[in-house]
């Protein structure tokens, strides 16, 4: 999983297609309808959570979904999207001879048309216009479309699209060009952060700002409509609240779609790749749109934000020494935890038993809100979120217990040892001084021979 999931909301696990329900009392669930696309993914953008995936890492042909990257490189390398560009038909005319001409889409852009980069982005993102994508690639790269493709691949590596490789800016069929549902979702999430991208992709109909009146005398009739039928209110595939981002069709790659839907404050991104273009009876079908709609319906019907841990929940207690009164303190979560949750799974099945205390015992005083430890919420053995545990209330210290504790502890303290050593040294010094004083006193008491005494007379010699 990507590093983002080690972040604030570890709610990726509640995406229950990845959870083994055999260890719980839950009945499990499946999508109510079959997903026809070979690869699919549904992400809640609000918490960056994958809530459904099918073959999300299988390599598929992107088709004109490539235009998402074309738009990214254009937006990031064009200082002013209002800059005008004169269209040169020779930049894309060679595509007329491609083997898979039916895969290509055109927007009635002609040679010498003068359009802003903004216009070209609208034409490309709404209709998959190869005139627009080739013109963007040619001009942004300074006249070398292959250089632009290299810029696309460099950006893919920077974003972390590890299973994606681009060979052209149009999405034209090329077996060497591939991607995955996971990479397309990651690319789209990146693109949505860029200026103008969301606005462009969310537009259903657009008219160029600076038409060449010679090529387009009826300016009002020159309009580009988004190819995503989910945005067409008159279509049977209309889906309220959808933002159409991009569709793609390839004869050899099937139908692809990336769509964004918003409802009741929830935002979902759906990706469907390699959907059949025809039914078993040979009828034209739009299973990619049906798959996106089904994924959105499933999410809106069965997922909602639920409080899985209240900040008032008591999750254990710790013993408190020297307490005045209760000799324990209760622990509660520091904050409330709300996660996007599947409504058929009871939140009571979430385990709260994985608690790590900072200390096994506390000493008073303890203040309300003081950090005591952490609890990790788990479902089916997988972590959902980690929350700090704090003290519910104050625990005051008993003066009597504290004084007795200090008195008992003092003989074992380093202060006591230091005091004992210092006292011993001082006593030793005192004894030495006392001995010295006694010796000196005795010396002072011993009689001394007078310096000028009269010599004793020897009477015998005198005679």
Where are these regions (language model features)?
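Bacterial N-terminal signal peptides that target proteins for export
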Residues: 1-9
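Domain-terminus/edge residues, biased toward the C-terminal soluble/receptor-binding domains
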Residues: 161-162, 175-178, 182-183, 188-424, ...
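Alpha-helical transmembrane segments forming the membrane-embedded cores
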Residues: 457-463
């Amino acid at each position: 999983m990507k590093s983002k999931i080690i972040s604030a909301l570890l709610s990726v696990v509640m995406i229950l297609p990845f959870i083994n329900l055999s260890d719980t009392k839950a009945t499990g669930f499946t999508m109510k309808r079959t997903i026809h696309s070979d690869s699919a993914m549904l992400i809640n953008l609000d918490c960056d959570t994958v809530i459904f995936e099918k073959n999300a890492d299988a390599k598929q042909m992107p088709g004109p979904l490539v235009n998402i990257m074309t738009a990214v490189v254009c937006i990031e390398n064009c200082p002013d999207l209002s800059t005008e560009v004169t269209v040169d038909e020779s930049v894309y005319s060679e595509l007329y001879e491609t083997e898979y001409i039916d895969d290509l889409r055109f927007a009635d852009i002609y040679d010498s048309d003068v359009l802003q980069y903004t216009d070209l982005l609208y034409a490309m993102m709404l209709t998959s216009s190869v005139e627009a994508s080739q013109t963007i690639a040619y001009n942004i790269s300074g006249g070398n479309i292959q250089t632009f493709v290299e810029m696309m691949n460099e950006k893919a590596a920077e974003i972390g699209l590890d299973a994606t490789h681009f060979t052209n800016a149009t999405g034209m069929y090329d077996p060497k060009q591939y991607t995955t549902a996971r990479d397309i979702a990651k690319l789209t999430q990146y693109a949505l952060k860029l200026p103008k991208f969301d606005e462009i992709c969310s537009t259903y109909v657009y008219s160029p700002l600076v038409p060449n009146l010679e090529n387009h005398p009826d300016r009002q009739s020159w309009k580009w409509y988004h190819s995503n039928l989910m945005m067409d209110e008159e279509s049977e595939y209309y889906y309220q609240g959808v933002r159409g981002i991009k569709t793609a069709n390839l004869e050899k790659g099937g139908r692809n779609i990336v769509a964004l839907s918003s409802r009741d404050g929830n935002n979902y991104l759906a990706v469907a790749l390699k959907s059949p273009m025809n039914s078993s009876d040979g009828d034209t079908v739009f299973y990619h749109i049906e798959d996106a709609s089904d994924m959105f319906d499933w999410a809106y019907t069965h997922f909602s934000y639920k409080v899985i841990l209240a900040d008032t929940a008591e999750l254990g207690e710790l013993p408190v020494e020297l307490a005045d009164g209760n000799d324990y303190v209760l622990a509660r979560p520091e904050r409330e935890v709300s996660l996007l949750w599947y409504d058929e799974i009871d939140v009571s099945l979430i385990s709260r038993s994985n608690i790590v205390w900072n200390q096994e015992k506390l000493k008073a005083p303890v203040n309300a809100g003081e950090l005591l430890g952490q609890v990790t919420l788990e479902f089916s053995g997988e972590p959902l979120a980690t929350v700090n545990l704090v003290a519910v209330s104050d625990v005051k210290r008993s003066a009597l217990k504290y004084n007795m504790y200090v008195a008992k502890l003092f003989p074992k303290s380093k202060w006591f040892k230091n005091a004992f050593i210092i006292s011993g040294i001082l006593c030793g010094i005192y004894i030495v001084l006392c001995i010295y004083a006694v010796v000196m006193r005795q010396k002072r008491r011993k009689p001394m021979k007078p310096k000028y005494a009269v010599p004793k007379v020897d009477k015998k010699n005198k005679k």
